């Protein structure tokens, strides 16, 4: 008689699958958390690579105010002590310091990519700081408990918010005009708001200080945009005493980070032209007027910085997306107070921008600038749309979460259990992907280096040689740069407009014309040296004696007809009699005065 082997675990144990063959729940959850945590940053990196395109090649991306130079020196200009408003403080000093560790063009690429990574991941992290709208409670794609963490928010919703914040007309126009320092503060804005809204009422000083670092590096305008949100967020939580404590903490940090540019601004008188109010006023770049363009995050004062293809039929669809995002913020995000203070900052920024676009607002702002030059920070009002961009990104994110959840519930309800599973997955997934891709599809002009406008360029070898000659001279005296204009269009930079690079290239004091021509308007120079030299440069006849009296040691001609007409011969001798031509080629002529 055969004896049957008895399994001590019972007959059912043989029917159960072996646990080591099953996927491990802990590993699965860890992988899901990793995907949810790092996806926004990776998507931001992908957006940065797509936006920069040819600009990622070796060399420098040089466009309007985006002036990076090889091995930038520390000079008086770096610290805002050369005259004029210290707009590039401390951003130039940070770049100069980082360029001691790696090539300056690599520093530039890392900063530009960091802007997209911080912006996308920050907006994604902000979408669900706490709570969820009641309207989303029945969504099967949302957590059932009353509090929710960022990791519980649908990934599609977080990515939609991140993509919208990192890829929009505001980012495109500010990137083309070269205001990377402002965009650095823009990228850090959601992290500042998150540090003020997350956790208890008491501010964690270290976390807030770390979140403010991008704005601190960006300087005055980056900090001004950040303050527009940080101050109302500080007083939006706690009782009266706690609100006062929070406000004092935020003001203290903002003040401390403002010292690098505030000190030179107080030490050296700042001169501003009130005509800049009209020159820098917002302009319509869509069929919906200046106010509509601003609501859609466009409206830059410089018409040359509008992305190619923007403003046509795609702008109509983009307006619909913006209105849906604003509705999502007002109806879904704001009731849960997940981004306290953001609505106030967004509204204040929009009011500042619209005021500059209207005649009464421009008149009032002109009077303010005449009364105190510090109000000149409000001339370019479109830059204060940064909080509105964040509000629209958050609104789009929660709207996508609501739509995806509602679609999943509707599809699942239309099919019996066990059927329609594919549709229940594909339809919400398609809606989520569409929400993520909408900003990119509607603004293709930002892709591939803004349609080729942002590309890499190399400074000519003669420029490096001229720098060695001029900085190696121990005799005192400034360098005068001609032609007498603020912007250049160098052939070696593809004829793209670029702000004069020589002040950042030389350690010696450089005098150039920083007056700005906008259409038929001229905004007067802000550097007192430029105002002093303007009558001399514009006069006819020999300039040698007057330039020497003005303290000029070198004259640099780097563009225009002066290169061909005054390099040598009788014309050059009559213009600067006795001057030595140290270097002359098709890109540059350098004169040294005796």
Descriptions of predicted regions:
Residues 252-255, 397-444:
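Signature aromatic-anchored transmembrane alpha helix within multi-pass, membrane-resident enzymes
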Residues 44, 120-126, 150, 154-238, ...:
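Membrane-embedded helix bundles of polyisoprenyl
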Residues 44-121, 163, 167-175, 180-184:
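Membrane-interface coil-to-helix junctions
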Residues 78-79, 250-330, 381-382:
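Periplasmic/ER-lumenal interhelical loops and adjacent helix-loop junctions
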Residues 37, 41-45, 436-594:
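Extracytoplasmic
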Residues 239-245, 324-364, 410, 418-427:
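Membrane-interface helix-loop-helix junctions at transmembrane boundaries of multi-pass membrane enzymes
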Residues 110-145:
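Transmembrane-helix motifs of polytopic, lipid-linked glycan transferases
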Residues 171-183, 347-395, 402-411, 416:
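Membrane-helix boundary/interfacial segments in multi-pass membrane proteins
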């Amino acid at each position: 008689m055969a004896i049957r082997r008895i399994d001590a675990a019972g007959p059912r144990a043989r029917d159960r699958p072996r646990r080591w063959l099953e996927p491990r729940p802990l590993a699965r959850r860890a992988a899901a958390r990793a995907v949810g945590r790092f996806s926004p940053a990776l998507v931001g990196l992908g957006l940065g690579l797509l936006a920069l395109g040819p600009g990622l090649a070796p060399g420098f991306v040089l466009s309007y105010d985006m002036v990076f130079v090889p091995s930038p020196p520390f000079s008086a200009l770096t610290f805002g002590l050369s005259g004029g408003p210290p707009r590039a403080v401390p951003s130039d000093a940070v770049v100069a310091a980082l360029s001691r560790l790696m090539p300056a063009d690599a520093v530039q690429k890392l900063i530009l990519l960091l802007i997209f990574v911080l912006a996308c991941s920050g907006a994604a992290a902000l979408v669900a700081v706490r709570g969820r709208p009641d309207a989303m409670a029945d969504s099967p794609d949302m957590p059932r408990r009353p509090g929710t963490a960022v990791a519980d928010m649908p990934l599609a919703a977080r990515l939609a918010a991140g993509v919208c914040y990192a890829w929009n007309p505001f980012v495109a126009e500010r990137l083309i005009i070269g205001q990377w320092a402002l965009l650095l503060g823009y990228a850090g804005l959601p992290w500042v708001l998150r540090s003020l809204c997350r956790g208890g009422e008491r501010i964690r000083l270290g976390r807030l200080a770390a979140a403010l670092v991008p704005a601190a590096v960006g300087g005055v305008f980056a900090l001004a945009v950040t303050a527009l949100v940080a101050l109302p967020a500080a007083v939006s939580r706690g009782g009266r005493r706690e609100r006062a404590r929070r406000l004092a903490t935020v003001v203290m940090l903002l003040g401390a980070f403002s010292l690098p540019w505030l000190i030179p601004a107080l030490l050296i008188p700042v001169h501003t032209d009130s005509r800049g109010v009209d020159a820098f006023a917002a302009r319509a770049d869509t069929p919906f007027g200046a106010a509509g363009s601003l609501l859609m995050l466009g409206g830059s004062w410089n018409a040359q910085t509008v992305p190619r293809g923007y403003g046509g039929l795609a702008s109509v669809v983009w307006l619909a997306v913006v209105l849906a995002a604003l509705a999502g913020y007002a109806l879904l995000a704001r009731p849960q107070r997940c981004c306290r203070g953001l609505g106030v900052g967004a509204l204040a920024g929009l009011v500042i921008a619209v005021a500059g676009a209207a005649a009464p607002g421009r008149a009032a702002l002109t009077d303010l600038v005449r009364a105190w030059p510090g109000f000149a920070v409000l001339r370019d009002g479109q830059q204060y749309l940064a909080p509105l961009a964040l509000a629209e990104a958050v609104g789009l994110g929660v709207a996508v979460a609501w739509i995806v959840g509602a679609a999943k519930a509707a599809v699942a309800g239309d099919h019996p259990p066990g059927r329609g599973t594919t549709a229940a997955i594909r339809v919400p997934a398609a809606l989520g992907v569409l929400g993520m891709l909408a900003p990119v599809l509607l603004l293709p002009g930002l892709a591939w280096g803004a349609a080729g406008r942002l590309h890499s360029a190399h400074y000519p070898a003669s420029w490096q040689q001229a720098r060695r000659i001029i900085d190696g001279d121990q005799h005192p005296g400034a360098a005068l740069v001609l032609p007498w204009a603020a912007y250049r269009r160098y052939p070696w930079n593809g004829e793209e407009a670029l702000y004069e690079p020589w002040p950042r290239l030389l350690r010696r004091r450089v005098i150039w014309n920083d007056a700005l021509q906008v259409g038929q308007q001229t905004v007067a120079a802000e550097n007192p040296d430029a105002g002093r030299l303007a009558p001399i440069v514009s006069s006819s006849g020999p300039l040698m004696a007057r330039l020497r009296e003005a303290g000029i040691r070198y004259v640099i001609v780097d563009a225009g007809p002066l290169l061909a007409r005054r390099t040598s011969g009788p014309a050059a001798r009559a213009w600067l009699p006795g001057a030595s031509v140290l270097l002359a080629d098709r890109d540059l002529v350098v004169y040294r005065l005796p």
